[in-house]
Amino acid sequence: MSLSLQERGEVFELWVSSYFEQVMSLDLVTTPFLAARNVNRDPSKLRTLERMSKDELDGTMDHGVFARSSSILLRVVPEVLYANCLRALVDTEGVWRDVDVLLLWCDESMHDCLWASKFVAELARAPPAEGKQKRQIEVERLEGANHFVSTTPHYRTYRT
């Protein structure tokens, strides 16, 4: 049985707003680890979309945004994207040379968020290229949160 495009979108929205089993360290994040990781079934960890009223959802969700903005990322040449990531996150010789990076990663977030966080954490630990000064990158864990801002009280984010 296959799902329509709309049904796939609905399933994706529920999956992406889920809380997953907690990850204590980004060092644990590997492909097999993520493949074996499950949605957290604790009743207090109800999916974000299941906790929001219809009015809240209608006021915050834009189902057409993917087609307008994010889908272009699927067509980017990976080498170009990687070079741009390095330039933005590490290079202090370009624009905003005095800007530091603070990555907040959520330990119950979906797999892609953890993988990206691990990537940035590895950049932070890597030595600078020869003759280069590297941007300061800090990586902090938000405990008990998924990647939806509404699930983490704002004071916790500001305090971190």
Protein language model features and the residues they cover:
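Short amphipathic C-terminal alpha-helix that caps PH/PH-like domains
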Residues: W15, Y158-T160
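Alpha/beta-hydrolase
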Residues: M1-K118
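Active-site-adjacent alpha-helix of alpha/beta-hydrolase-fold enzymes
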Residues: M110, L114-R135
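Short, conserved active-site loop motifs that form the nucleotide-linked donor/cofactor pocket
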Residues: V101, I137-E138
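Catalytic histidine-centered segment of alpha/beta-hydrolase-like enzymes
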Residues: V139-Y158
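Solvent-exposed, non-transmembrane amphipathic alpha-helical segments
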Residues: A35-A36, A121-L123, R159
